[in-house]
Amino acid sequence: MSPTDPLDDEDTFKILVATDIHLGFMEKDAVRGNDTFVTFDEILRLALENEVDFILLGGDLFHENKPSRKTLHSCLELLRKYCMGDRPVQFEIISDQSVNFGFSKFPWVNYRDGNLNISIPVFSIHGNHDDPTGADALCALDVLSCAGFVNHFGRSMSVEKVDISPVLLQKGSTKLALYGLGSIPDERLYRMFVNKKVTMLRPKEDENSWFNLFVIHQNRSKHGSTNFIPEQFLDDFIDLVIWGHEHECKIGPTRNEQQLFYVSQPGSSVVTALSPGETVKKHVGLLRVKGRKMNMQKLPLRTVRQFFMEDVVLANHPSLFNPDNPKVTQAIQSFCLEKIEEMLDSAERERLGNPQQPEKPLIRLRVDYSGGFEPFNVLRFSQKFVDRVANPKDVIHFFRHREQKGKTGEEINFGKLIIKPASEGTTLRVEDLVKQYFQTAEKNVQLSLLTERGMGEAVQEFVDKEEKDAIEELVKYQLEKTQRFLKERHIDALEDKIDEEVRRFRESRQRNTNEEDDEVREAMSRARALRSQSENAASAFSADDLSFDITEQTADDSDDSQSAVPSRGRGRGRGRRGGRGQSTAPRGGSQRGRDTGLGISTRGRSSKATASTSRNMSIIDAFRSTRQQPSRNVATKNYSETIEVDESDDDDSFPTSSRADQRWSGTAPSKRMSQSQTAKGVDFESDEDDDDDPFMSGSCPRRNRR
């Protein structure tokens, strides 16, 4: 369909769907720094050219939890450029906006704000990269929401129970129920689904007349026993699921035969990991919804940097490489050079006729050197391609896989055998490393009071969210809780008995996962509150508080400049913003200037010594210490619908058949037809070959639901 197709009438929703844009990814890289912004510009331009009703984002709009000023500025600039204007919004919102956007200071959709002139509304959930953090649980999307550019929905305020209330939209006779669930740690959400703590609310009136669209940002592929969300967990009244977080582009809706809904995985719009899933061509989707029918048109992204990957197993070429040959390294280098040149030639051929595509491609050659071979110097080899590829430092990746006990003669499956580094998008997580360490550590270094899970969560907060006080607050909180337990039990002050009671108390907490979750949340909230207090205290200093003798400062700078070379190329004498004689710590760190005479320091030597002493106290010492800190406290579907997948930009239209014609034919043999099942009536039209299209089958049974 073209943007001016007559079937795009007042009853048809046109929605641009995208996920995982990752604005700011590698923004400091000289070659790839602007890739995310250029592609985001293309996505918004596609929305404008296709005259969509709104844009739907599936999380991870930003790559960093705390995006830089450049990233925020570029994002706001593009949203203002494309999403503001005089074009009227053709649909209305009929749900309670105070429920949909209740966590915002402006609990209404942005295009209904009289102070804003929005032409293309943007609805977005948050992902795991830009999720809410801090004492106030804010994220970068909340900044965009407050500015009036994004409608942030799908946010859960509770960690015990999730009630998903839909945003109800109507355009003409078409009713769209938009459900969203921002990123939640997979293990926690998995447990909530198992315990029936996730509820998707439905409209009270005429619930079967709504097209139900659900946006989620979780692991779809299985990374562990509970580190993913099975599609079977989702309610079966859903019609289409937009699945974010997974970067491989599988935007064509696929049918879940158990729940009988469709899943579309748009994938990322930028290559963030040099892994096989990222080699798939990137697309966004133009979703049309009319009544109970839908059509998904794939729109290729033409500004995405090319990415080519190839695997080489040296042992598979015995005629070319002999490990005992002293010149085998030179032969391997020549072979790798030839492979990379082939990929560069392929990139050049594909780039012809597309001036929007970046000139330098991403190239990755993975070399398995098992069998007695030795890797060569990758950095020296990569210097040949500095001016030709966008990733010269990691063009080649050497690896070895462990020898298998039994040879099956099958081809090597790199996805199963390769131990990928973190740079290739593996799911290596901090809390898993902590758990693995304590599982393999010797007995004398095992935790006796703290829990592995709590420590893992605290370290993850420290690494991912830069919560510098997370570990310290967790230790203090669990120590306080243990002390209270021992006091309540009136344990004798015998070291052996106290150690035994502490061990039992720790084991009981480990068995009670809910209690341990509460401990971690309380400790993290205390760490965030402490950081917020430190930030407020740092920002409370005025120019009068930090004033000093300009003459002394100038003399001091003059002396320093004669005796030492500055280590940073920053200007001197910055006034109230701080020169070399000042140092401000925005997060509560040390604020000691050099020769300023202010004596402002939040953590002097004495405090460090005290902290070190308290950390080294044993359990018995802590218990005996007299100084105590205060404690801190489903309906049956009887409708039919039509779903189409458009693989090209050619004109196509919604089927004009009657309601009876939209139902599946019952002539094709099927084992399930004898079970009195009714068809959901989902039909696909595609430009691909019918033999390869799983949606063009003559019959698709549907069972009756209770």
From Swiss-Prot:
The keyword Nuclease applies. GO terms for molecular function: 3'-5' exonuclease activity; 3'-5'-DNA exonuclease activity; DNA endonuclease activity; identical protein binding; manganese ion binding; nuclease activity; single-stranded DNA endodeoxyribonuclease activity. There is a cross-link at K339, K481 (Glycyl lysine isopeptide (Lys-Gly) (interchain with G-Cter in ubiquitin)). Its main location: nucleus. Residues 603-617, 625-641, 654-679 have a biased composition (Polar residues). Interaction with SAMHD1 stimulates the double-strand-specific 3'-5' exonuclease activity. RBBP8/CtIP specifically promotes the endonuclease activity to clear protein-DNA adducts and generate clean double-strand break ends. DYNLL1-binding inhibits the activity of MRE11. MRE11 activity is inhibited by C1QBP: in absence of DNA damage, C1QBP interacts with unphosphorylated MRE11, preventing formation and activity of the MRN complex. GO terms for cellular component: BRCA1-C complex; chromatin; chromosome, telomeric region; condensed nuclear chromosome; cytoplasm; Mre11 complex; nucleoplasm; nucleus. A motif (GAR) lies at residues 570-594. There is a cross-link at K384, K468 (Glycyl lysine isopeptide (Lys-Gly) (interchain with G-Cter in SUMO)). The modification N-acetylserine is found at S2. The modification Asymmetric dimethylarginine is found at R570, R572, R574, R576, R577, R580, R587, R592, R594. Disulfide bonds: none annotated. CDD domains: MPP_Mre11_N (cd00840). The keyword Chloroplast does not apply. InterPro entries: Calcineurin-like_PHP_ApaH, Metallo-depent_PP-like, Mre11, Mre11_capping_dom, Mre11_DNA-bd, Mre11_N. The modification N6-lactoyllysine is found at K671. Pfam families: Metallophos, Mre11_DNA_bind. Component of the MRN complex composed of two heterodimers RAD50 and MRE11 associated with a single NBN. The MRN complexes dimerize on DNA to form joined MRN-MRN oligomers required for DNA double-strand break repair. As part of the MRN complex, interacts with MCM9; the interaction recruits the complex to DNA repair sites. Component of the BASC complex, at least composed of BRCA1, MSH2, MSH6, MLH1, ATM, BLM, RAD50, MRE11 and NBN. Found in a complex with TERF2. Interacts with DCLRE1C/Artemis and DCLRE1B/Apollo. Interacts with ATF2. Interacts with EXD2. Interacts with MRNIP. This is Double-strand break repair protein MRE11. The gene is Mre11.
